[in-house]
């Protein structure tokens, strides 16, 4: 059981339509940007001992995961994306006097599952706090969050590291995961002529449940951080606690970057980078920020690196200063007086754990035991539906390596080009794919024939018909009789006496010509290994 509550809020006071606010002027200036660009240019031309010092980045990431609950965290307003502004608001999420928050059990359940998925210690008792700051997207003037007693702490994620950064699997530590409510969304409009700039506030998102996941500063490059973010999104999607959509803001990553000389234990000045709506953009933003800080240090301007929040400007491909970064004291945390401590028993945690699916790390290990190449494993694990489809094909008797090869290659290429076709709705059933791969594995049909008939299977032209029946009807069985293949080779050699004479005279490049000719003569049905063996024996008889 869980305990957390307060009186039910009133649904009255709802008001639709955008709220217009004066636009906050940005703190960055073109002059400052030019100074930073000049520092980078100056650093590239410096020589001497300072220029030879090697620097490394120290990177941690705070990830806000929006939970896919039907209602907000502390009221009954719908938690939906893209509806008309300010149509899912109530006195509770707008902070009206006399209203009290009531914690959703679904939020707790999903937060516990996410904590378990992060290999973290789920606390049986946690509490909520008020994080206070004043900004137009925060209607209450404070955010309900968790400060010193989060719902989960400690933990790790095993991340597949890009080859450029050494490859392999690296364990990234998780400091904590805590529940909080989201803020509203501001849309900024620039000044036009005599019309000043302004912002519109949409509070539909205010109060939507989040879990903030704070990593240890264990990462060193933009690619590593992007790999960590992608793995965290996989976990979120496998657990079905959120959709992890960066472009819609349901997963947002704030990256803390500092630079220090290699070998030094003390951290440099931490800079927060925000507003990256893809993992590719995240990698580029971090690498730019590392270069910016390194350039300033090398130019003797390290004191210009200040603790601040910077935004990634996709158009200019650079980070731009937004505001001074607040410290913990600035938020004036204190216990949320309207919510009791969150307490649940072991039975509740076990119930949450029992509903969890197999997670990406365990699937990778299982597929590695099947002997699948790491590249194929990564492609398969990327999509939960693809894993389910592949497992169904294995259960139907598909040879693992053959099936993974076709699924991650030709089938995925077809899906990429097809419009509005998901793995689950693909005409090619897992049973058909299993039979298809078995026929190739057993040598009944060749890979060439497989490529010829696969498009028809993917497009559903043969319905649910057995692949074996299709092969029989079309006469596509592979020719593996040595005498039959020898007759095909003889016909090819007899039809091309000039090329045969040139080959036997030393023009070895003509081998490919004869291989192709045999393939065409057999209609693509000749056993490749056997036909190559017989062809080479026949070609070399007169040399």
UniProtKB/Swiss-Prot annotation:
Entry keyword set: ATP-binding, Chloroplast, Ligase, Mitochondrion, Nucleotide-binding, Plastid, Protein biosynthesis
Compositional bias ranges of the Basic residues kind: 12-23
EC number per UniProt: 6.3.5.-
UniProt-recorded name of the protein: Glutamyl-tRNA(Gln) amidotransferase subunit B-1, chloroplastic/mitochondrial
Note from the entry: This protein may be expected to contain an N-terminal transit peptide but none has been predicted.
Short name of any one Pfam family annotated for the protein: GatB_N
Gene Ontology terms for molecular function: ATP binding; glutaminyl-tRNA synthase (glutamine-hydrolyzing) activity
Organism this protein belongs to: Micromonas commoda (strain RCC299 / NOUM17 / CCMP2709)
Gene: GATB-1
SUPFAM superfamilies in the cross-refs: GatB/YqeY motif (SSF89095), Glutamine synthetase/guanido kinase (SSF55931)
Top-level EC class: ligase
Family listed: Belongs to the GatB/GatE family. GatB subfamily.
Keyword Plastid: yes
Subunit structure: Subunit of the heterotrimeric GatCAB amidotransferase (AdT) complex, composed of A, B and C subunits.
């Amino acid at each position: 059981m869980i305990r957390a509550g307060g009186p039910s809020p009133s649904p009255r006071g709802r008001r639709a339509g955008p709220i217009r606010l004066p636009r906050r002027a940005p703190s960055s200036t073109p002059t400052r940007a030019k100074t930073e660009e000049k520092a980078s240019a100056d650093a590239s031309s410096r020589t001497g001992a300072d220029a030879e010092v090697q620097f490394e980045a120290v990177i941690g990431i705070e990830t806000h995961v929006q939970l896919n609950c039907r209602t907000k965290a502390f009221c009954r307003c719908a938690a939906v994306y893209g509806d008309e502004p300010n149509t899912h608001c109530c006195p509770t999420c707008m902070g009206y006097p006399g209203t009290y928050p009531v914690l959703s059990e679904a939020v707790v359940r999903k937060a516990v599952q996410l904590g378990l998925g992060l290999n973290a210690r789920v606390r049986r008792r946690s509490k909520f706090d008020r994080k206070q700051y004043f900004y137009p997207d925060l209607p209450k003037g404070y955010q309900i969050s968790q400060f010193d007693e989060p719902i989960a702490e400690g933990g790790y994620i095993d991340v597949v590291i890009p080859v450029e950064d050494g490859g392999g699997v690296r364990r990234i530590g998780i400091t904590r995961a805590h529940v909080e409510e989201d803020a509203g969304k501001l849309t900024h409009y620039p000044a036009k002529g005599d019309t000043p700039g302004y912002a519109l506030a949409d509070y539909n998102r205010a109060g939507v449940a989040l879990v903030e996941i704070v990593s240890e500063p264990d990462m060193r490059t933009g690619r590593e951080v992007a790999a960590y973010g992608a793995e965290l999104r996989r976990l979120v999607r496998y657990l079905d606690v959120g959709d992890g959509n960066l472009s819609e803001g349901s997963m947002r990553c704030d990256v803390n970057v500092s630079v220090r000389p290699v070998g030094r234990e003390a951290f440099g000045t931490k800079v927060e980078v925000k507003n990256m709506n893809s993992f590719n953009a995240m990698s580029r933003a971090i690498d730019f920020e590392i270069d910016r800080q390194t350039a300033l240090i090398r130019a003797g301007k390290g004191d210009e690196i200040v603790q601040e929040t910077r935004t990634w400007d996709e158009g200019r491909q650079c980070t731009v200063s937004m505001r001074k970064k607040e410290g913990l004291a600035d938020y004036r945390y204190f216990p949320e007086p309207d919510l009791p401590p969150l307490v649940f028993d072991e039975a509740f945690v076990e119930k949450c754990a029992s509903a969890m699916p197999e997670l990406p790390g365990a699937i990778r290990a299982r597929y590695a035991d099947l002997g699948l190449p790491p590249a194929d494993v990564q492609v398969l694990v990327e999509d939960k539906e693809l894993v389910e489809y592949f497992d169904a094909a294995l259960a139907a008797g598909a040879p693992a390596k053959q099936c993974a090869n076709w699924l991650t290659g030709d089938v995925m290429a077809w899906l990429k080009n097809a419009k509005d076709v998901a793995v689950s709705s693909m005409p090619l059933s897992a049973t058909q794919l299993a039979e298809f791969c078995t026929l190739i594995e057993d040598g009944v049909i060749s890979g060439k024939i497989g490529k010829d008939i696969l498009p028809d299977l993917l497009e559903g032209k043969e319905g649910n018909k057995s692949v074996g029946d299709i092969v029989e009807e079309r006469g596509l069985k592979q020719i593996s009789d040595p005498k039959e293949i020898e007759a095909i080779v003889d016909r090819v050699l007899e039809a091309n006496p000039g090329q045969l004479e040139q080959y036997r005279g030393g023009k070895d490049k003509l081998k490919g010509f004869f291989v192709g000719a045999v393939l065409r003569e057999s209609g693509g049905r000749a056993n490749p290994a056997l036909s190559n063996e017989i062809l080479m024996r026949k070609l070399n008889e007169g040399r």
